[in-house]
């Protein structure tokens, strides 16, 4: 069974502790894809939810001291119940405090994957690239950044940009799909982190397969959305992207995938 069919069959509960800007978009994107999102940030909820979860997303976009403690508590409980956790270290290259939080979560808690743009992942491994807040300029050595992070942390890495790189156990795969409209809609990268959290726990020991499917499904849905009427307009693209996530099939992935 393919990873996409498995996701739709299992409808994994994904606990999304994410930033305030993208919660609605993230929840709707996961529902469209076939997962079951829970956006609770109430500490007393964590154990009750995580014991049944198929994935956990920690996105540090709207960072506070209280949220840092929430991330730590969630990751501790996720490890107790063997729930795969994905970290999205938003803008960790933009300031020392964010870098400190990201380093803490990576070094002291169990993570199943890290997803970030080239600037964010590069900052985690000390590679200097052009970065501006949550955005990252076009980077030529995205594969090297992914491999460096995978080697340093021994965690599967997804680095996104004009081309995406996935590094698992020293192997790197490049995904050339995607839409130029994605950066024009706030939250597309953050939703990808949640999609990764939805796929990563579906098949034990098949992290590379799961991550490839997650990124391909996501990026090809973006291509489909852009080609629809008025898909070149951000508002229409946002709606059509959710529609495409709902409608995308394994046949679409097989036909349109561009992987190296």
UniProtKB/Swiss-Prot annotation:
- Pfam families for this protein: HK
Give the cofactors, semicolon-separated. Mg(2+)
Q: Does the keyword Glycoprotein apply?
A: no
Catalysed reaction equations from the record:
5-(2-hydroxyethyl)-4-methylthiazole + ATP = 4-methyl-5-(2-phosphooxyethyl)-thiazole + ADP + H(+)
Gene Ontology molecular functions: ATP binding; hydroxyethylthiazole kinase activity; magnesium ion binding
Give the source's domain of life in one word.
Answer: Bacteria
Q: Which residues form a coiled coil?
A: none
Residues bound to ATP: 115, 160
Q: Which InterPro entries match?
A: Hyethyz_kinase, Ribokinase-like
UniProt keyword Nucleotide-binding, yes or no: yes
Give the record's pathway: Cofactor biosynthesis; thiamine diphosphate biosynthesis; 4-methyl-5-(2-phosphoethyl)-thiazole from 5-(2-hydroxyethyl)-4-methylthiazole: step 1/1
Q: Which UniProt keywords apply?
A: ATP-binding, Kinase, Magnesium, Metal-binding, Nucleotide-binding, Thiamine biosynthesis, Transferase
Q: Tell me one GO biological process term.
A: thiamine diphosphate biosynthetic process
| Enzyme Commission no | 2.7.1.50
Write out the residues that bind substrate: 39, 187
> Would you identify the family this protein belongs to, as annotated?
Belongs to the Thz kinase family.
Q: What does this protein do?
A: Catalyzes the phosphorylation of the hydroxyl group of 4-methyl-5-beta-hydroxyethylthiazole (THZ).
Q: Which protein is depicted? A: Hydroxyethylthiazole kinase 1
Organism, as annotated: Streptococcus pneumoniae serotype 4 (strain ATCC BAA-334 / TIGR4)
Lineage per the UniProt record: Bacteria, Bacillati, Bacillota, Bacilli, Lactobacillales
């Amino acid at each position: 069974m393919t990873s996409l069919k498995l996701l739709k069959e299992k409808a994994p509960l994904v606990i999304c502790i994410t930033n305030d800007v993208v919660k609605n978009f993230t929840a709707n994107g996961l529902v469209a894809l076939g997962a079951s999102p829970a956006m609770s940030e109430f500490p007393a909820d964590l154990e009750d939810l995580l014991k049944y979860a198929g994935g956990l997303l920690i996105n540090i976009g709207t960072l506070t001291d209280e949220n840092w403690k929430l991330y730590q508590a969630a990751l501790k409980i996720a490890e107790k119940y063997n729930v795969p956790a994905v970290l999205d270290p938003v803008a960790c290259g933009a300031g020392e405090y964010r870098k400190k939080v990201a380093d803490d979560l990576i070094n002291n808690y169990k993570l199943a994957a890290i997803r970030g743009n080239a600037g964010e992942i590069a900052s985690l491994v000390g590679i200097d690239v052009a970065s501006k807040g949550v955005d990252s300029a076009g980077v030529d050595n995205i594969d090297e950044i992914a491999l460096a992070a995978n080697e340093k942390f021994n965690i599967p890495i997804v680095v996104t940009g004009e081309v995406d790189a996935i590094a698992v156990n020293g192997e790197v795969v490049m995904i050339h799909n995607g839409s130029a409209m994605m950066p024009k809609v706030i939250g597309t990268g953050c939703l990808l982190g949640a999609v990764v959290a939805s796929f990563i726990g579906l098949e034990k020991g098949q992290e590379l397969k799961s991550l490839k499917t997650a990124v391909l499904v996501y990026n090809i849905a973006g291509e489909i959305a852009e080609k629809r009427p008025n898909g070149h307009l951000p508002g229409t693209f946002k709606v059509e992207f959710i529609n495409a996530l709902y409608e995308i099939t394994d046949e679409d992935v097989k036909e349109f995938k561009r992987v190296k």
